[in-house]
Amino acid sequence: MPYIYLIIAISTEVIGSAFLKSSEGFSKFIPSLGTIISFGICFYFLSKTMQHLPLNITYATWAGLGLVLTTVVSIIIFKEQINLITIVSIVLIIVGVVSLNIFGTSH
């Protein structure tokens, strides 16, 4: 169950980040509200995850996969450009997250 919580936390963090970009500095009501609600749900499920998994694994997985998925959203939805350094960095983040989950300590 903790990994289900983590998936929900990551998903809502990515959704919240997209809403945050769309809110244009909290100047648009609906995207601003979406940001607040999404991050509220995100942190609730992140805290539920931390009841079962170590902080280092939880946070690294949440932050790393959140960054990767947010980058994908930024490319697809917001038409942002990336370069080779960005791609290499994302691959390194994925390797780090996978390594922590395979070799990291558990409760």
UniProtKB/Swiss-Prot annotation:
GO biological process: glycine betaine transport
Extracellular side: 21-29, 76-85
Principal cellular location given in the protein's record: membrane
Recorded consequence of changing residue 31 to A/G: Decrease in resistance to ethidium bromide, but does not affect resistance to quaternary ammonium compounds
Effect seen on changing residue 42 to A/G: Decrease in resistance to ethidium bromide, but does not affect resistance to quaternary ammonium compounds
Membrane-crossing residue ranges in chain numbering: 3-20, 30-47, 57-75, 86-103
GO cellular component: plasma membrane
Record flagged with keyword Ion transport: no
Residue intervals on the Cytoplasmic side: 1-2, 48-56, 104-107
Localization of this protein: Cell membrane
Top-level division of the source organism's lineage: Bacteria
Topology in the lipid bilayer: Multi-pass membrane protein
InterPro entries: Small_drug/metabolite_transptr, Small_multidrug_res
Keywords: Cell membrane, Membrane, Plasmid, Transmembrane, Transmembrane helix, Transport
Function of the protein: Multidrug exporter. Is implicated for the resistance to bacteriocidal quaternary ammonium compounds and ethidium bromide.
Name assigned to this protein: Quaternary ammonium compound-resistance protein QacC
Source organism: Staphylococcus aureus
Lineage summary: Bacteria, Bacillati, Bacillota, Bacilli, Bacillales
